[in-house]
């Protein structure tokens, strides 16, 4: 039996389906959120809440344990289990690596202009200081857990996450790396987008209201260019704090005027897809691995994608031959000139070869071989 510790996230239903397709009847998924009710994960016979699992765990024998995003709750569960002859896999999601482990060691995820963290960075802010001390202690505990309990480090899409982990924590160099991804390209795109290409000249900033999008940083860069009457679409309807969203909207209106178009409410998928197809320039201010699905969609559709070179995704994309551009060096010509057709085709071909269902199944099988 293969035990999967997961969060209550949309992606997990697809994860259940694909692991069951590869290993039918061999998987048990435990949703580790605090409550027993699930918002996104569909209840099935092989899906348990945390409390249900705690009551029945003695009924199961496991050969593998998969941690889909490492956090304290999952570590607590694992610490109650016997791991004799159990192979333990940590599948990195991004937050668990960059925010929780690399930031306490000095990795920067926020641009200096990011309003969400200006206050706590002030030297006299005791709360900010205490938070940083706590983060360091939590990181030390997590690394100790990984050293003692984890056998394999698994990266989702961006394989250089593993090298970043070892750069900051060389004591984990004996942990074996495995490759993996959650979604094949046809699922990422959906039936509408897989047949589409860019047909507009709009711009898009980021993928959510998460402060790690560094929206204000991107808006400031973009404000120095002449964007004419093009729309600057900024998705802000989920995954962010109210004060941060308000700050982004305020600055966007101030610097970009009527061109600035924040998406503050849920947009139906068909309408959002039309927006994505209208975007010829996609700007991502993230300094950590994030928004990879949105980046893949933009590249597939034929948009020019701009990333900060401090973002590990920039390095990853270029290592696979994908054409991406440096955000900090964006020019007027860059936004006025569409991506060449030969480059659009090449990006699409690379993504189509990387993210096939067949390759995903092979990687899942390779996890245990």
What annotation goes with each model-predicted range?
Residues 56-74, 87-93:
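Short N-terminal targeting/anchoring amphipathic segment
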Residues 130-176:
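A short, active-site helix/loop in glycosyltransferases that binds the activated sugar's phosphate group
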């Amino acid at each position: 039996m293969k035990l999967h510790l997961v969060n209550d996230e949309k992606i997990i239903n697809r994860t259940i389906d694909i692991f069951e397709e590869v290993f039918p009847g061999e998987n048990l998924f435990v949703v580790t959120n605090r409550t027993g009710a699930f918002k996104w994960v569909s209840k099935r016979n092989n899906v348990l809440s945390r409390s249900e699992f705690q009551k029945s765990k003695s009924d199961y024998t496991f050969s593998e344990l998969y941690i889909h995003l490492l956090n304290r709750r999952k570590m607590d569960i694992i610490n109650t289990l016997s791991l004799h002859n159990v192979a333990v896999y940590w599948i990195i999601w991004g937050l668990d690596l960059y925010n929780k482990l690399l930031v306490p060691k000095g990795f920067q995820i926020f641009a200096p202009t990011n309003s969400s963290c200006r206050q706590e960075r002030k030297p006299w802010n005791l709360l900010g200081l205490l938070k940083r001390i706590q983060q360091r202690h939590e990181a030390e505990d997590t690394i100790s857990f990984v050293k003692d309990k984890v056998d394999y480090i698994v990266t989702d899409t961006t394989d250089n996450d593993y090298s970043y982990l070892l750069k900051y924590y060389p004591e984990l160099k004996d942990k074996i790396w495995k490759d993996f991804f959650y979604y094949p390209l046809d699922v990422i795109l959906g039936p509408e987008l897989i047949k589409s290409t860019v047909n507009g000249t709009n711009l898009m900033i980021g993928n959510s209201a998460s402060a790690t999008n560094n929206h204000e940083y991107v808006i400031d860069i973009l404000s120095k260019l002449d964007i004419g009457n093009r729309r600057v679409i900024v998705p802000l309807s989920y995954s962010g704090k109210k004060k941060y969203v308000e700050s982004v909207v305020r600055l966007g209106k101030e610097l970009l005027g009527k061109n600035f178009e924040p998406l503050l409410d849920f947009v139906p998928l068909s309408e959002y897809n039309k927006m994505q197809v209208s975007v010829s320039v996609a700007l991502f201010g993230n300094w950590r691995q994030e928004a990879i699905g949105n980046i893949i969609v933009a590249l597939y559709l034929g948009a020019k994608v701009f990333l900060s070179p401090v973002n590990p995704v920039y390095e990853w994309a270029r290592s696979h031959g994908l054409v991406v551009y440096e955000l900090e060096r964006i020019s007027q010509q860059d936004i006025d000139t569409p991506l060449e057709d030969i480059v659009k085709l090449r990006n699409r071909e690379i993504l189509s070869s990387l993210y096939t269902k067949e390759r995903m199944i092979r990687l899942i099988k390779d996890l245990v071989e």
